[in-house]
């Protein structure tokens, strides 16, 4: 009985090992796009989602907070728990997850820290470092739900987060070049990982 029990226990342990190992093997990549209102984050996020293809999840701060939940923004915004759960889902089930929004560092730092905890070195963060005048110019080329006065009120100069290793996106870069840069960054790391695993 002891030998049979040992064999069964060993088999169960082996099955659990491979199941857990399989779960750990899948770790999606997270792209974070931050910056002031009107800088073009959403446009880039949607274009990047199409470029990356199926199984790419797009988490838009405005969509979650304003449209889905209709809650106020702030340090303890009720959007944070749902955005955190979406990051967890993306890590386990999506090849790529894109998180985009203004997301002031002061208010969303806990979310960025969670992103690092979940995705580790698979976090690719970009900050749209544009002048106020440039964001207004870009905003005026689209359908406007708000104006320059609101944008001035929301404005935060160079709100880089020390919780993220953010690369700066400047006004010289258009949507296509930004998408290509991010795509190139993702592929460069993918090739390096494949080389190291040989």
Indicate residue ranges for each PLM-predicted region.
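Walker A/P-loop
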Residues: 42
